[in-house]
Amino acid sequence: MRKEKEKKILPTLKFMLKTAVKNKPQLFIAYALQVVVSFSQTMVNIISSKYLVDEIAAIIGGGKAEEHIPTAIFCIALIVGVTLLAALINYLVNEIKNVYSEWFNEYFEVSLSEKVMKMDFEHTEDPDTLDQMNKAKEGMSWYSGGVVGILNGFFNIVSNGVNVLGVIAIIAVTCPLLLPIQIISLVLITIFTNKSNKLDIEYFKKLSKINRLFGYFFYQLSNPSNGKEVRLFDSKDMMCDKADYYSNETIDTFREKYKAQYKYMQYSNLTNGLRDGLSYFYIGFKALTGAITLGDFTMCVSSASTLYWGLYSIVDNIAATVKACGYAYEYLKFDAISDRMTKGDKSVSDGEHVIEFRNVSFKYPRSENYVLRNINITIKQGEHLSVVGLNGAGKTTFIKLLCRMYDVTDGEILIDNINIKDYSDSEYRKLFSVVFQDFELFAFSLKENIILDEQEDEEKLINTLKMAGLYDDAMKLENKLDTTIFKSYDENGTELSGGQQQKTAICRALYRDSPIVILDEPTAALDPVAEYEIYKHFNKLVGGKTAIYISHRLSSCKFCDEIAVFADDTIKEYGTHEELVKIESGIYSEMYNAQAKYYVENVS
């Protein structure tokens, strides 16, 4: 257990210190200043109080006031002056730390997002990775306090350590027996605190998963786009019940945690009472017997309190820092998730490209079942291929493998007789313009959603909008192409219809102008006539480019060069529309005959 803690604490603390030094080294000046101020204030208060009390006692005892008042006034002025100065410096330092805390929070949010965007795609569909990502996000933010939170704990240990050394020197001279009393009580309280902190870590892991599930249902309830389904299917109660369930799970877990920690809190309270009683008895006895002055009594009481709370603060901050490092370590664990996909460095040559699947089989990570088996197909430059099949036949998986979102389990995929693993990822993916059925639009302007990182070409953009049938709708918007999509971050934004959203996604693919274009059922929300028009325009625009169409409605089949029919985890039929439709009791012919009545007039 101890070695396990060290594996978390030391790397995390080292990482935090290194990150702070690299990005905001001036933060350490603020911490050093706070340490000096804390020590100065502690020593001034303890020592000045002794002399102040002794001077007042001398006056009360019949001494000449004029001999003692100046010293008393000086002590008061020194205490007040140092206190005010310390308050001012601490205020300024805390403001600086708050600013840096926000900066580091944003820094790690961006770093985590970049990690998600760069990691292998398979990780983004893995529940364990998603849970770890949630732990990383929570662990690096409010659970640990991030860089500033952990550095606060670290420098509190340093500051209190310096203060403790100062008061130990005072106590060793005046009331030496106070040292074992304070230390023994501290050891006991440390034991109780550690046991309580272990429960915090234990319940954190349990709460992290519950919070992710609760967050999902809360998002679904607050997401405006779910409004139609919730109302039409009267699912509000079901959604609320699920959200309430996980909310109650959270409350019950916290209640269970606090109940388990309660006894350790009571043990600590009892120890504190015994410590204070023994300390006051010892100091009071020395004062009554004349061994120390009244000022010494005050100094001993103050020193004993400072010693105990200094030691307690050291132990408490060590425990808190250990706990915080345990939380923040979840970020390091997430950041350490390695990619399994090999990274090539070959550049993609210009010119014609031939795609070849050779005996490709694939099963998803953590699954024993193959979703594709023995896929063999060659797609030549400029060929238009239609991929058809029932839901779950593996059509989208086929595209994911081609785009190298996953690596094949067996076999290989070649582009121009070179295994796609040998190509640079960024170079390879430039070959493709893809519109998936679960495409994502962003709360940016319509123009930005289409162009993304591509260079802006207004003429090309207008032509693309016209080809996709979105130009007229775009020109009717208040700010035309600069109109923000959705109202999430802009009250003047527009809510596009499902069909308009799909046309926008198609525009994005067309605008990229890649040599291989893929449409993975992006027109599901359109009616058959509109779908056919989109496909027809799209096919004209694609021209000599390689194109792969996936659609249940078979609208693209007649104008495609070849058709691949997926069923039973493999390609069951392959050929032209005319060839496949003639196969008696064939999969394609049955699908075509079942659907022909919906669009035969439009595609004839």
Language-model-detected regions and their locations in the chain:
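Transmembrane helix-loop-helix hairpins at lipid-water interfaces of multipass membrane proteins
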Residues: 28-89, 169-200, 278-281, 285, ...
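ABC ATPase nucleotide-binding domain helical subdomain, centered on the C-loop/LSGGQ "ABC signature"
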Residues: 414, 429, 447-491, 535, ...
